[in-house]
């Protein structure tokens, strides 16, 4: 059995928004093949690795990825043919060196990530192992609590709330399968609640409902009603998580809540979150402050870090350097993990490991532009991260990840452990 790379082939395919993205196949001398499709975000952090787009307005409004495809089929393939796919760190280092830029702007983070993931999948296939076992070894056994985005706003919907995501977390379930069922039942109860109130039940990019609502906490009221109507207890069995994506509403040093006609300072934004946490069973807030509002983040952690999970997404962009700075500054206590923010599997695993060693949590996440690729489901189990964010229990691009986790839980059998209330290890006094 040889794990040496024999061929690398990239192509342009479509993501869940109908935009082009890159798919990569890596074929080994053993005949085993790994395939990966790279996701794409709508609200992207300024510090993310660069996603290479063509800029040719005559194709896909400039969003084509033929340059990234060419980079894989020519530069990367030439460099990696004959390379050992089982040596992931060396392979990723070779890709990073081949690019030679701080943000992967020469070859594109999408090109590099596609090859990085496809190589790992090919090596796993060669060893006859599922990806989670290949990456995580014998200790990979924790099934994550899903953060289910059941109401969308911000960049993921139009004419909705200022804030981007309103999620539920079934922490009280005994298994992933049960938690997923609870979430799906609440999702359907929410649809009826929204419909009965006379609002639209259209959905956003990630499958959550996106009605036009008068205030930013109106979705929380609807979600609370839906949880109870589905027969569950908010604040006991089900908690709420938020991703307001506040970088999108941050301008000239202030936070502009257009839905409410208010402009807030960093300190006032922190007080806004403190008030919401006191009124609703919120367990996690992601990007509660803008990506470069470091003082605001420190204040937020000092006010709420002992009670809830404070997740950095645009703030940290899966970047070890920014994560290390945030740990030292006591800003946030959790990192969102998005493979394409940093652009390689090795760098992603390094960020997760640093977070876990530092007493932080790591939440493995999709992007709003997704596909049938289920890599993140295996990744979250491989790293025992305990939390996954992959949308509503709707749309095949989201459901694919949930279904893969159901398969993994079944395969693990009695060894499978649902993270449940133990997922929030960064909070001094967890649930």
UniProtKB/Swiss-Prot annotation:
Localization terms from the record: Cytoplasm; Secreted; Cell surface
Q: Does this entry carry the keyword Secreted?
A: yes
**TM segments?**
none
Q: Where does Mg(2+) bind?
A: 243, 286, 313
Give the record's GO biological process terms: glycolytic process
Q: What keywords tag this UniProt record?
A: Cytoplasm, Glycolysis, Lyase, Magnesium, Metal-binding, Secreted
Molecular function terms, GO-annotated: magnesium ion binding; phosphopyruvate hydratase activity
Q: Which cofactor does it need?
A: Mg(2+)
A Pfam family found in this protein is Enolase_N
The chemistry this enzyme catalyses reads: (2R)-2-phosphoglycerate = phosphoenolpyruvate + H2O
EC number(s) per entry:
4.2.1.11
| Disulfide bridges in this chain | none
Catalytic residues as annotated in Swiss-Prot or TrEMBL: 206, 338
SUPFAM superfamilies linked to this entry: Enolase C-terminal domain-like, Enolase N-terminal domain-like
What role does this protein play? Catalyzes the reversible conversion of 2-phosphoglycerate (2-PG) into phosphoenolpyruvate (PEP). It is essential for the degradation of carbohydrates via glycolysis.
Name the UniProt record assigns to this protein: Enolase
Give the originating organism.
Chloroflexus aggregans (strain MD-66 / DSM 9485)
The gene name on file is eno
């Amino acid at each position: 059995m040889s794990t040496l790379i024999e061929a690398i082939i990239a192509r342009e395919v479509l993501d869940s928004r109908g935009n082009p993205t890159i798919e990569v196949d890596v074929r080994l001398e053993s005949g085993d093949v790994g395939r990966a499709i790279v996701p794409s975000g709508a609200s992207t952090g300024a510090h993310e690795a660069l996603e290479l787009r063509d800029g040719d307005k005559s194709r896909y409004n400039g969003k084509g990825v033929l340059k990234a495809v060419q980079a894989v089929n020519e530069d990367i393939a030439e460099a990696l043919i004959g390379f050992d796919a089982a040596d992931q760190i060396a392979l990723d280092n070779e890709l990073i060196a081949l690019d030679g830029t701080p943000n992967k702007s020469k070859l594109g983070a999408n090109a590099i990530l596609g090859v990085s993931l496809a190589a790992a999948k090919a090596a796993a296939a060669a060893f006859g192992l599922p990806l989670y076992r290949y990456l995580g070894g014998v200790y990979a056994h924790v099934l994550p609590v899903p953060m289910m985005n059941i109401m969308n706003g911000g960049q993921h919907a139009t004419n909705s709330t200022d804030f981007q995501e309103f999620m539920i977390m079934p922490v009280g379930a005994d298994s992933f399968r049960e938690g997923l069922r609870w979430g799906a039942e609440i999702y359907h109860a929410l649809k009826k609640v929204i419909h009965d109130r006379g609002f639209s039940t259209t959905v956003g990019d990630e499958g959550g409902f996106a009605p036009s609502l008068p205030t930013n906490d109106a979705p929380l009221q609807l979600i609370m009603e839906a949880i109870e109507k589905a027969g569950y207890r908010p604040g006991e069995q089900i908690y709420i998580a938020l991703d307001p994506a506040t970088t999108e509403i941050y301008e000239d040093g202030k936070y502009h809540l257009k839905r409410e006609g208010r402009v807030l300072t960093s300190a006032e934004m922190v007080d806004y979150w403190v008030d919401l946490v006191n009124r609703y069973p919120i367990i996690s807030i992601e990007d509660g402050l803008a990506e470069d509002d470091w003082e605001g983040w420190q204040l937020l952690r000092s006010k709420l870090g002992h009670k809830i999970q404070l997740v950095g997404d645009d703030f940290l962009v899966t970047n070890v350097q920014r994560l290390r700075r945030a740990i030292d500054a006591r800003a946030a206590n959790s990192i969102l993990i998005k493979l394409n923010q940093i652009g390689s599997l090795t760098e992603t695993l390094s960020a997760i490991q640093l977070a876990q060693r530092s007493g932080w949590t790591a939440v493995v996440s999709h992007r709003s532009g997704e596909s049938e690729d289920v890599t993140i489901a295996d990744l979250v189990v491989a790293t025992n991260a305990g939390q996954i964010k992959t949308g509503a229990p709707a749309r095949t691009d989201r459901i694919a990840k949930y279904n893969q986790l159901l398969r993994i839980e079944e395969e693990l059998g009695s060894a499978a452990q649902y993270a449940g209330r133990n997922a929030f290890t960064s909070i001094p006094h967890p649930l």
